[in-house]
Amino acid sequence: MLQDGSTPGVVVSGYSPSTPQGGLTARPVTPGGDAERRQGCRPGAYDGVPATGRIALVDAGGCSMDDKQRVAAGAGAAAVLVANTGPGEMHTWLADPAAARIPIGGVTQETGRLLAAEAQAGRTVQVTLRSLTERRTTENLIAVSPGGNPEHTVVSGAHLDSVPEGPGINDNGVAAAVLLEGALAAAKGHGTRPEDNRLVFGFWGAEEFGLLGSQHYVDTLSAEERKRTKLYLNLEMIGSPNYGLFTLDSGATDPVTGQRPAPGSAEIERKLTEAFAAQGRKSLPGPADGRSDYVAFLGAGIPTGGVYGGSFEAKTAEQAALWGGAAGRPYDPCYHLTCDRTAQYSREAATLHGQAFQTVLTHYSRHRLGEGSTPRG
């Protein structure tokens, strides 16, 4: 709550501690200096800043939420609010719940500006963050083609879970349904030809709680199994009603790990771009923001690619001219909300993304990275 009585929203980060009952009342404080320092990623960010007992206000980007929390807590802050630097809300989580020290959440860019003004004026604000953390068990569902060359394994995946707040039709039921269709198509004779590769279809659990299912899958692969896994294709939110046609950006650096996609990822991106073009549509490289199941494969050095329809980010005017829809509005206005239901998703978007995915999956089911259009035989 601000001094004028307004109550801008805060999205609590996954695994964040809660504020005390009744909330936390304190002055917000921002790290001074350049853009890098305002991200609050390095211990020196708060040098000369009276952060003890205050609410740290930092910009998104530059490091993980864990790092932002650790640095702010080390400076004596009582909580951290991370302001988006673009349109939309901030939906985040902590990668290491055991290391969580102080409450942390995300706010929109506009709310960040309001809080910065409160800090400049020396006024206090009240922040209330409530979270529940429990230990639970979930499962991945893995389907493996009975035939195909195991020395050249192609993995495709989509997460099955949703956030507690919504039924998760676009995030991520539509993608899981398309993945299932791919598996059913592969079941009809795949593996009977000598050029066929082994196909694995991963329906991941606990993506919304830190990409846990896909990370577990990669972590439990033997060294030999990792070597055999030649590429990964990811499907995420492909039915967004105000959709974009995005491919995973093979030239981007992961904002948390600093890793770049493995060699071969650019070819996968190009194949997906060509598959959209074959439908008369232009795709664009999407945000490689570390928020989907490709991350575990990227971290293991496995070439990655994928399709994505957009979530809470706002569609630009240029994108609206390219794909239609409403500029300045989220790709999915029901992201992580109760309205994420079957009536909301775009069948057109699901078809475009699904066809592009199936085209590329079919190609790599019989080809290796770097091969042309002629199957091995």
Predicted stretch roles:
Residues 97-99, 185-212, 232-235, 370:
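Short helix-loop-beta-strand segments that form the rim/entrance of peptidase-like active sites
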Residues 34-36, 61-64, 85-89, 111-112, ...:
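Solvent-exposed loop/turn segments at secondary-structure junctions
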Residues 314-377:
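His/Asp/Glu-rich mid-to-C-terminal helical/loop segments that flank catalytic regions of hydrolases
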Residues 16-40, 96-169, 181-184, 189, ...:
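Soluble metallo-hydrolase cores and metallopeptidase-like ectodomains found primarily
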Residues 62-67, 74, 102, 106-110, ...:
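Soluble non-cytosolic domains of exported or imported proteins
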Residues 1-6, 204-311, 315:
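Metal-dependent peptidase/peptidase-like ectodomains
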Residues 13-109, 167, 171, 184, ...:
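Extracellular/luminal Protease-associated
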Residues 54-59, 78-83, 103-106, 141-144, ...:
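Structural recognition of the beta-strand scaffold that forms the well-ordered cores
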